[in-house]
From Swiss-Prot:
Gene Ontology MF, one: RNA binding
Protein family according to the UniProt entry: Belongs to the universal ribosomal protein uS9 family.
Protein source organism: Nitrosospira multiformis (strain ATCC 25196 / NCIMB 11849 / C 71)
Keywords linked to the UniProt accession: Ribonucleoprotein, Ribosomal protein
Protein name per UniProt: Small ribosomal subunit protein uS9
Amino acid sequence: MNGTYSYGTGRRKSAVARVFIKPGSGVITVNNKPVDEFFSRETGRMVVRQPLELTGNLDRFDILVNIHGGGESGQAGAVRHGITRALIDFDATLKPVLSNAGLVTRDAREVERKKVGLRKARRRKQFSKR
């Protein structure tokens, strides 16, 4: 990686994304694969491009992402969070636009643990009156 990169770390559920952006032609690479190949679902691709579309920078930056952990949805959210932070690192004037869209805040929702005596986190065994 040569040149000047702006960096942002994104997290969502158990996924962690390290995002590097630099001025370029709009190529997004996730774990050495094009974004359209890495995220098989269209929703994942839309989530990843959301901060770029919102700020009008879709074709202005080359983005390199290293991601591990989590599933497809969590990884897409982590990449979005990382791109948002990297854009703010590159140009702080974009922060109000991204903040109003709710992209700067880390989504703190995590999977609730399974409790002893229950089937799942909150699901109880069926109650039989007789």
